[in-house]
Amino acid sequence: MKALIIDPAVHSLGGHHFNAVQRLRDELAGLGVAAPCLGSAYADRRVVDELACTPTFTRSVYGRLYATPGEFTDSVEETGRQLAEAMRRSGTPDLIILPCCDQVSAMALARQLRRSWSRPRPRILLWLLYGPHHLKTPDDPAAANLDGEARAAFAELAGSAGSIEAYCETPEMADFYRNLVPFGVGVMAGPGLPARARAARAAGRPPVVSCIGFANRAKGYRLMPQALQHVLGRHGDVRFMIHGIVKGSDAEADQPLFDRLAELGERVEVRQEVLASDEYLARLAEADLLLLPYAPDVYRRRGSGVFADAHHVGIPVVAPKECAFARPAFEGGWGVAMKAYDGKSLGIAVLEALDRLEPLGACAAEAAGRAQDGLGRVLSASVEGKTGRSSGLASLLRRFRPRTTPGSA
């Protein structure tokens, strides 16, 4: 069978888009299925080589401004042209996976599949990571006018695909989409790197508090200077490792913030390089406490790939009380909630977590032991279902094929 991964946002090494495609390809390879990728037109050479990625899309899923009513139509047309050209060369696959699907990708793919009416309709596996506006929670009245375009796009995709299996990362986001799309929506974290066992913290070693990932504005890095100063003045041993990539993010002008953090002294390590998968996992495993001060006005319903990784590794977290992704940690005893969204509240939450680090860590380790990674099962079912369907169709066609009799030409 043929599989294809589509993610217009994958363009460089590191980050959860790269990790998602890499994990999907590895899992599918284990099932004997090759899965090339269509990614950003600006994908660098390592992405092209390591992910079998064809640079395709000039618009990222994060590239919309939502400024005019015609922007959606323009985005669909441009994405559709680029998708049609790429699939003209590669052919229509049996299985299409979109690890980060929005309404533009959905509508463009639906129209492309309608053009390929003579071919068997593919099975589609997709994740809906955010609402119709990627920078606003679906509850925001300013995003409500986008519900119509999303409803139309996913309805058209449902009518063009053989079947659709869809997931959100939180129950709250899944509830929103169940009222918007004509297919079922489950709850499962997006494809991430396989969990790696973490060594227990050595007795007497100072605790390490970390923040890691792309430094987009909604990730809350602007709260760090005040928070770290608050903690450093009240805790004599703690060490901070603050990793944030500003290049390619929407916060490239925030470099002075990281310069300020680097001036806070020897107990603060600041890193900004792109991390390969192994480096990311190694850095994550060093953390005794993970900071996820994500803006609630963006992440109220959304999931977090870093949180999912922390869950599987067994790391306590600090996050805003409103963020749905962190609710399992709050309820499971391995998360501390920020009472307000500002730097001082982040610092207070960190101090609370440091005072309770041993029981928080024990609960995090217990939660990690119970965590289930369902990606392999889902992909296996998708491959087996599609292969069985293709075999059944081939058998049916053979029944109607003219037979060659002895003596016939």
Model-derived segments and spans:
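Nucleotide-activated donor-binding/catalytic signature segment of Leloir-type glycosyltransferases, i.e.
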Residues: 158, 254-281, 286-289
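Nucleotide-sugar-dependent
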Residues: 292-308, 320-322, 326-327
